[in-house]
Structures are given as C-alpha cells and as structure tokens.
Amino acid sequence: MEDKRGTYGNEAMYEITPLEMNLSSEWKQKEVLWGELHSQFESVQNYLFMIGDEERMLTIMCEGAALLPDSILLRYADYENLKKLGEFPTAKLEDYIQINHIKIAQLKTSNCSLLELSLDKYRRKDFEQKRKQIHDFIAGSERKSDFERLPERYKINLNGFIEAIEGSYSERMLVSFYKLIGAGRGLTPAADDAIIGVLAGYLLKLSLEKKADTYLEIVGPILANLCKEKLTTKVSLKYLKCACRGAFSQNLCKLIRILSGECKEGIRPILEEIRKVGHSSGMDMLYGLDMMLQRG
C-alpha cells in the first residue's frame, strides 16, 4: 500500500507488514540506527547496523523459511520488491524499518529465546526416548553433517569444549572454542553450527537442573571474544552471538521445547525441517546437540 504522506527521492513511500519478526531488546534504541546491505541471496538479505560499539546483523527473509533470531519474515511479493532496490540500499531503523522507500512495520516480536523454558510437563522417560530418536535420526540420515567430515581433531576439540562448558572451566572452554570456530566451508562453517547445537543442548540441560539463570554468565567469555575479534564469517558470527544470548532459530527452539515437554508435537517432523537447513547447517547443529545430550 502506498503512503502518500512521504517520498524517498522520486519514489512514494511503500508500507508493508511482515508475516513475523524477532528483534532482541538491543534493537529498540532511542536514536535512529543506520545500516547497509551486507549480503543478498535468493531468499535472504543481511543488513549491518552499529548498536553502541557492536556490529549487529538484521536478516530479512522470504516466506517459507523458519524465523531466525534478529530477523524479519516477508511475504513473497514484498520480498521480491525489496530485491529490486539495487546493490546499495540504505537501511534505517526507528519505530519501523525502512529500506530506501519501503517501510516495514514493526510487529510484536516472536519468541526465539530458550532462556525461560517451561518444564511443567517434563518427563524424564519421554526425554530419554526423544534423545535416542535424535541420535538414531542422525545415524540413519542420508544427508550427513559436514562436521563429521572434518579431521578427527575437531571432534576431540568439540568434546573438550563440551566438557569445559559443563564444568564451567572458562579458560579451557575458550581454548577449545578457538580450536573449533571457523572450521568448515560456507557462510556458516560446520564447526560453528555444531557449537550452536551444543549451546542449545547446554541451555536445555541447565534448565532441567533449574540453573538456566547461570547460562549468560557461563558463556559470557565466548560472547565477549566474538564481539571483539574477527573469528569467522559475519553471518556465522551473528548466529553464534545470538546463541550466546540464548536465542536460536524457531526450528531449533521447537525441538528443544519438544525435549522439555513444553511442546507435545512429534519429534520427527521438526528433525526433518532442521535437516533441510542450508547445505549441512541443520545436520551440523543436530550433531552438536546430540553430542551434548549423549553425555547424560
């Protein structure tokens, strides 16, 4: 719908309402935030903004994908209009998101956080059964994790990372983390995706132990290093930082809520959805999650 109250250059302002969105509280600033296009793909655009001293990425996606943290989901026609803006669109964030002459209304943010899991319906027997289903699903899948194809030392390092994070050994955790991050190909390397799976599983285990409030402090050293060093791709950096803040993709959140008993849907359909993510990103996350859950 055109908005006759304003223009951008020679273009009338065009307002759209997204299907869904997730923006963490840090995006709600008093001052206007300006951003620039970082990368564009067939169904995804990534924009970089500075929030304080930290570079943050906002992702705009076409319908059909699962919502990600710090992202906006648009209808197909609206996303196609966004793609026509050229190579260097200007992004602005205030009480709406504006990309050149397109204004995207802000909705109530959808939940992508696992910091406050409901455990009212948790049953240990059900959890153990579902944990085994994840393990068997990975073992039986024709689509394999790229992480499994990395040299053996990365599996040893991932196991060391899990041991360190469970024991709250900050220095050992960081040493193992540095040996893992960035390993693999693509925008989100396999080791990075596996780390995200580990963190989701760790937050679940802390929740089951009534210790979820310690998560941010324990993984804080990882977040601090991600914010100050260029350790991996900017796209992967976004999702690792979100995970350190307790935020994950809606698909991964749903899987964790099925494990916790909060969601009563069957586990197989969501495993299939996660398997489809990226070249092997979904399987890499499941691999990391399984590694964490198999430790009991």
Q: Each predicted region: which residue ranges?
A:
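Acidic, carboxylate-rich catalytic segments that either coordinate divalent cations
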Residues: 251-296
